[in-house]
Amino acid sequence: MSNPIIIGIDHGYYAIKTRHFSFPAGITAYSHEPYTLQNTLEYGGKFFVCGTGRQPILRNKMENDNYYLLTLAAIAKEIKQRGEKAECSVNLAAGLPLAGFGREKKPFREYLLRSSQPVCFKFEGIPYKVTIEDVKLFPQGYSAIAIHPELIQNEPSVLLMDIGGWTVDLMRLDNGVPNASTCRSLELGMIRCIDETKEQIRRDVGLSVTDAQVERVLAGKACSMDEDARSIIQKQGRLYTERLLSAAMESGFDLKAIPVIMLGGGAAVVKGNVSEQDGLCRVFALIDDRVNAEGFER
């Protein structure tokens, strides 16, 4: 019998990430087959279109089945991408913030593992029969260092800043080891930045721009847009960066004294808005938001 396929999944508030994919964490249920099977999961007699916008923020991701359903979609995407058989065994590797790792580890493992194996479902019309043999959980952020150990080489202390959709998780590494007493979680993720930016544009210009438009301009990419709205987005990106750096300093991290490794979906935005006047010691940015998921697989 072949060994189980190891699939790393980063269950973000804003996006689901695997080694090869990143897609929005929204999900919409239908009682009948939708007009297209693209990104459509069929499970338990219902149809779910995965990657549609974003879902309401859940303090507890285990409150409903949405993240389990998104997990099945992520598994199917990875199986197809890797050229594996649709009937197979997998080991899931997922992550949790270090601040709540001990509290959430057991229930989140049970949430993903469940009792009825194998799991039978269809994704984009293809039937899958997947046995989830095990679920391993790892600290978010720290797992990315498994991919880029050179970032902490010769650095006695560094700050990991994982800028996600809803939270920004902070953790200091001393001699390459996480210092658990320094873990902080700030509710200052990119969703906050995007929502406040859209509201500012509505007030100042009277336009209703989309999340996707705001994200693209924040990332420094071209798109057709009213120039006043574009200017507001760029200004809000800088204001968000200032606020985040200030909150990190208030949490006890002297960013002028120790290097910062930024990762997560917001890393590129914040790195692009850091200026010399901020006086930061040194900033590294892992701008691929899939780096945590890849690290989980190590």
Where do the protein language model's features map onto the residues?
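Short, contiguous, pocket-lining structural segments
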Residues: 162-165, 189
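Short, acidic (Asp/Glu-rich) active-site segment that either coordinates a divalent metal cofactor
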Residues: 168-174, 182-183
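Nucleotide/phosphate-binding catalytic cleft detector across ATP-hydrolyzing
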Residues: 1-158, 177-192, 212-298
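Acidic, metal/cofactor-coordinating or nucleic-acid-engaging core segments within structured domains
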Residues: 201-204
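Conserved active-site beta-strand-loop modules that form the wall/rim of enzyme catalytic pockets
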Residues: 157-159, 166-171
